[in-house]
Amino acid sequence: MTQIGSFDLEKKTAVVAVILEKPLENSKKAAEKGADILEIRLDLLGIRTPERAAEVIREIKAETGIPIIVTSRSGAEGGKWDGKEEDRTGLLINLLSLKDGPDAIDIELSAGMKERNRVIKAAKDRETAVIVSSHDFLKTPPLQNMRTIIEEMFLAGADIAKLAVMPLSVGDTLNLLRVTLDFKDAGKSVCTIAMGSQGKHTRVVAPFYGSVLTYASIESNASAAPGQLPVDEVKKIMEMLK
């Protein structure tokens, strides 16, 4: 069974609201709009210290009670972290030591193996869900390459493998959905996203092929990735398609 906090991903796809500014205010808004999980983007929030990160997580949990994913995305994968890699992974590991810390940690497959493994081990030791992610903002890899990337994520220790790609054609999007369904049929928990206007519909369609998470913005004019839709719109459309 794959869970993030109390949310059982085997029963329902979670709508994840991405918090990239005004963390407490926007977390409350996300809760009001029906978000199932919050992703706290430490890099976009400009949070660099364990003390400030811990304070934000405690405040949000106290006010919303919603499960939290924490990540600090590297520049190579579309994030704003500009410090040392060991400081970035050290920040995540420090948060995992909190009594009421994050419910899931997201670490990139492209992170150095030593640092990535440290984060994953710390999460496993504390029974915290591990998301291993990969983001390609330029293209969609060939079908078999996408399968290989996801398999590598599970070999690295992922509970959930997250793959975000940039489709350049309808065929690219179909290939991503094909891969999603293949891993669903194999009993694996994946999150797949086709970014940009070509893949915008996958935000609400991929869950029907097996994507266990779909990421959404708080407002339509403030998204963390190309093609992200607002939380309330995602919830509404997914309900209509059930």
From Swiss-Prot:
Residues binding 3-dehydroquinate, per UniProt: E39, I40, R41, R73, R203, Q228
Xref: CDD domains: DHQase_I (cd00502)
UniProt-listed Enzyme Commission number(s): 4.2.1.10
GO molecular function, one term: 3-dehydroquinate dehydratase activity
Reactions performed catalytically: 3-dehydroquinate = 3-dehydroshikimate + H2O
Catalytic residues, chain numbering: H135 (proton donor/acceptor), K162 (schiff-base intermediate with substrate)
Keywords: Amino-acid biosynthesis, Aromatic amino acid biosynthesis, Lyase, Schiff base
Superkingdom of source: Archaea
Subunit structure: Homodimer.
Family: Belongs to the type-I 3-dehydroquinase family.
NCBIfam families (UniProt xref): aroD
Protein name: 3-dehydroquinate dehydratase
Name of the gene: aroD
